[in-house]
Amino acid sequence: MDEIKFGVFLPFYAFRTTKTGSSSFNLIRDIVLECERLGYYSVLLDDHLMLKKMPILECWTTLSALSSVTERIRLGTMISCNSFRNPALLAKMAATLDNISNGRLEFGIGAGVQKNEHNAYGFPFPSSKARIERMNEAVEIIKKMWTEEKASYNGKHYTIKNAVCEPKPVQKPHPPIIIGGGGEKLTLRVTARHADRYDWGYLASLELYKRKLKVLEKHCEAVGRSFHEIEKSCWPAGQIFIGENRKELEKRVLQLMPKGVILEDFMQTSFVGTPEDCIKQIRQYVNLGVTHFMLFFGDLPDLRGLRLFAENIVRKIDQIN
């Protein structure tokens, strides 16, 4: 069986630690360093420019800073919004980060979904079909920039001519490409064509995840690619709240859950349980061929859940295998 990996999705835009409400890079850095110490495989950041009035640091700049203070843990995006950056420039940024981090980049990319965010920053927000077409072309350009001496491309949405990206990424042939999204007609076809890893974030049920895998497998057949070449990744829950005492844990969830949300609804999209409960749920996905799990700890920046999961699951992975 392939190695099972656990990565942490870090909602760094949610941390308000100063009187002005500004995000604290020091806090983000300390959480990432703790993830590295505990043995997590990766930390992935979301790529948003604004979320209502919440403070948020720019994703790629933050990753660059984190890469200079860490040594082993892999760093990347879940996912980088294609609409925000020219793909040739994004390829250059990613190659630079892979060099700074000595080959630790996880490159996640998606078509973009937040219309208000695009409008506020002046980015076009065309139809879903057009955004996915753009993402497909962007990935083709990025792969060319990473692997060719001079890259040229003449597509419907993007054109480059003799573009040089030096130095190339440390990872060969290139950093792993994660394509985010679950659209069955278009996005999963792009995933079948280009992705090294499939991850759509949180899926509401094991049955829905099975369905997405079947659709992806059909697209792989259509484009002439082996379904087994693509690593399978998933989120076992929208948010994870893990504790040794379930009764005390549920009290904490009541304190941490968003105001105005019904507890039953919140529990349906979250995992609330003991390490043993979590292992049972993870095993179900392992049996489907999943080898990579993304974890969104709902109690961050409190480190108790992060540490408990590492001590009882990450460091005892043989129990799952």
Question: Which functions belong to the PLM regions below?
Answer:
Residues 66, 97, 107, 142, ...:
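Conserved, mostly hydrophobic/aromatic
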Residues 1-69, 173-175:
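N-terminal beta1-alpha1-beta2 module of alpha/beta enzyme domains
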Residues 12-26, 80-87, 173-183, 265-276:
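Active-site mouth loops of central-metabolism enzymes
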Residues 22-35, 90-93, 181-190, 274-284:
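Short, acidic/polar
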Residues 2, 127-169, 202-291, 301-304, ...:
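An alpha-helical appendage that flanks or caps ligand/catalytic pockets
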Residues 6-10, 43-45, 75-77, 105-109, ...:
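Hydrophobic faces of well-ordered beta-strands that scaffold small-molecule active sites
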Residues 2-23, 83-152, 201, 207-211:
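Flexible, glycine-rich active-site loops centered on histidine and acidic residues
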Residues 56-77, 134-141, 309-321:
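Alpha-helix-loop-beta-strand connector modules within alpha/beta enzyme cores
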